[in-house]
């Protein structure tokens, strides 16, 4: 067994198997574990998936939302223990793999059409 196979077998144990199918353009709500002192709580972060990066245990999604008129982006490691849950709110109909052009848009121009052919 070479080193790469050993690494893959260790990573396979850490992968989450309860993740929903997520696509670019979807609106998702990510529950993030926040530790404040001795207490731990789950903070929801809702926004549009503008990018996905595959790579086994290093799989990430970039979620963008507008907060008080300012665009906020956050990158989540999907298999991280800090990500408690992910729920797809609505499916988006897009024709690009990365939606970085939404960064330059303001207001109603940032809306994405809803997709009805994929179940939530």
Swiss-Prot record:
<dbReference type="InterPro" id="IPR001857">
    <property type="entry name" value="Ribosomal_bL19"/>
</dbReference>
<comment type="function">
    <text>This protein is located at the 30S-50S ribosomal subunit interface and may play a role in the structure and function of the aminoacyl-tRNA binding site.</text>
</comment>
<dbReference type="InterPro" id="IPR018257">
    <property type="entry name" value="Ribosomal_bL19_CS"/>
</dbReference>
<dbReference type="GO" id="GO:0003735">
    <property type="term" value="F:structural constituent of ribosome"/>
</dbReference>
<keyword id="KW-0689">Ribosomal protein</keyword>
<dbReference type="Pfam" id="PF01245">
    <property type="entry name" value="Ribosomal_L19"/>
</dbReference>
<dbReference type="InterPro" id="IPR008991">
    <property type="entry name" value="Translation_prot_SH3-like_sf"/>
</dbReference>
<protein>
    <recommendedName>
        <fullName>Large ribosomal subunit protein bL19</fullName>
    </recommendedName>
</protein>
<dbReference type="GO" id="GO:0022625">
    <property type="term" value="C:cytosolic large ribosomal subunit"/>
</dbReference>
<keyword id="KW-0687">Ribonucleoprotein</keyword>
<comment type="similarity">
    <text>Belongs to the bacterial ribosomal protein bL19 family.</text>
</comment>
<dbReference type="InterPro" id="IPR038657">
    <property type="entry name" value="Ribosomal_bL19_sf"/>
</dbReference>
<dbReference type="GO" id="GO:0006412">
    <property type="term" value="P:translation"/>
</dbReference>
């Amino acid at each position: 067994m070479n080193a790469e196979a050993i690494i893959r077998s260790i990573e396979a144990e850490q992968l989450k198997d309860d993740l929903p199918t997520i696509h670019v353009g979807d609106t998702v709500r990510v529950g993030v574990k926040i530790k404040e002192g001795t207490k731990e709580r789950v903070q929801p972060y809702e926004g549009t998936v503008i990018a996905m990066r595959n790579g086994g245990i290093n799989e990430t999604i970039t979620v963008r939302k507008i907060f008080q008129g300012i665009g906020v982006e956050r990158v989540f490691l999907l298999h991280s223990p800090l990500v408690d849950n992910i729920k797809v709110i609505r499916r988006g109909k897009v024709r690009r793999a990365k939606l970085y052009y939404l960064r330059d848009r303001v207001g109603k121009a940032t809306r994405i059409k809803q997709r009805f052919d994929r179940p939530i």
